[in-house]
Amino acid sequence: MKHWFFLIILFFMNCSWGQDPFDKTQRNRSQFDNAQTVMEQTEIISSDVPNNLCGADENRQAAEIPLNALKLVGVVISKDKAFALLQDQGLQVYSVLEGVDVAQEGYIVEKINQNNVQFMRKLGEQCDSSEWKKLSF
């Protein structure tokens, strides 16, 4: 019986041994690096999106979906980067960074705040005017 007790104690000690999550010297990656990796894996690359005269990116996120059909479902903000989570009507989630081309109309993500995301689209033949839209929770 004594041996079982020591084996159980040894087992629990072995299971509880690990890195201290509050020790900054043991950290080598942040949780946002992992989120960036996931975001890069889910990025939609579409070469058949028609080019906009105002410099729309051919790697547009949610290229077939109009902006008014997208819903803001989350925002992740860290020290050096921020990205927004947009959901379409088919419940697919797109993660977009600031400066990324989004939606069918070619809006660019200008600013990601805690409660909203601002989009801008260039208009006109010489792209001299702009249209602003905001999605919020």
Swiss-Prot record:
Example of a GO biological process term: establishment of competence for transformation
Keyword Nuclease: no
Keyword Amino-acid biosynthesis part of the UniProt annotation: no
Coiled coil feature spans: none
Name of the protein in its database record: Competence protein D
InterPro entries: ComD_Pasteurellaceae (IPR016506), PilP (IPR007446)
Keywords: Competence
Free-text function comment from the UniProt entry: Involved in transformation (genetic competence for DNA uptake).
Species name: Haemophilus influenzae (strain ATCC 51907 / DSM 11121 / KW20 / Rd)
Residue pairs linked by disulfide bridges in the UniProt entry: none
Pfam families xref list: PilP
